């Protein structure tokens, strides 16, 4: 399995959020534990997980997650309740070979096929020894 800890994101970061994510490329199963992420109103917005896969990179030896030609895989949508803690199974829409970055974005109800990454409250990078 590939584990990583959540940290503040790149755009509109959530400094209070914590937790971890783990994903096993062999079984294509994983989950997220998130604490302290701002609750969302499902009628207005939801959270969506994105997974960057080194195997899908144009140049796998030099991954560049912010490049325009790099498209992360949709890992599923979820809500965070007023309790602010959630355990969410990962629902990757495509097979993931070598995940190297996980990010949560804020999107419209129903989710999106491609995020504009205008709100990225938390990210996680797999631990080097994983």
Give the label of every model feature segment:
Residues 1-130:
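N-terminal targeting/export leaders
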């Amino acid at each position: 399995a590939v584990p990583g800890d959540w940290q503040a994101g790149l755009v509109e970061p959530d400094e209070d959020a914590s937790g971890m994510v783990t994903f096993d490329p062999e079984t294509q199963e994983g989950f997220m534990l998130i604490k302290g992420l701002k609750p969302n109103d499902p009628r207005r917005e939801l959270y969506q997980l994105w997974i960057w896969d080194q195997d899908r990179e144009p140049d796998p030896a030099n991954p560049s997650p912010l490049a325009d030609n790099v498209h992360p895989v949709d890992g599923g949508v979820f809500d965070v309740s007023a309790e602010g803690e959630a355990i969410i199974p990962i629902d990757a829409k495509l097979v993931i070979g070598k995940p190297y970055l996980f990010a949560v974005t804020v999107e419209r109800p129903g989710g999106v096929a491609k995020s504009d990454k205008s709100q990225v409250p938390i990210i996680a990078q797999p631990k080097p020894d994983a």
